[in-house]
């Protein structure tokens, strides 16, 4: 099988190596460029949970002012891995898609606790 990866190398490298080791032909043609955007300052104390839909969100987020024990919902294992590397401790992880993430949030977060970001 020939597999084409279009994400930036740092987001694809692990899978590229894995598929090559399995004997597949792999090409890398990055057509997606991920860049930081400026955003309004966020008071993280206003939130009881954070939803991360991408490891890239964590890559560009200033995490110094965030309590690392806050509940974090992660879309998949790559996002979870990035959150762990930044010191987050209270992670709930879906199976890699938004539909599963939504169900996980509905099952595990009581909105009476406060707001989510």
Write out the residue ranges for each language-model feature.
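Signature of uroporphyrinogen-III synthase
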Residues: 1-117
């Amino acid at each position: 099988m020939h597999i084409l990866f279009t994400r930036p190398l740092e987001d694809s490298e692990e899978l590229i190596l894995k598929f090559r080791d399995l004997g597949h032909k792999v090409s890398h043609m990055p057509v997606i460029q991920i860049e930081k955007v400026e955003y309004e300052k966020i008071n993280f104390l206003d939130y009881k949970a954070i939803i991360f839909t991408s490891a890239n969100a964590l890559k560009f987020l200033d995490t110094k002012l965030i309590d690392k024990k806050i509940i974090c919902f992660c879309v998949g294992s790559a996002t979870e891995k990035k959150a762990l590397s930044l010191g987050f401790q209270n992670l709930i992880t879906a199976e890699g898609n938004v539909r599963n993430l939504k169900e996980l949030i509905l099952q595990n977060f009581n909105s009476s606790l406060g707001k989510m970001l």
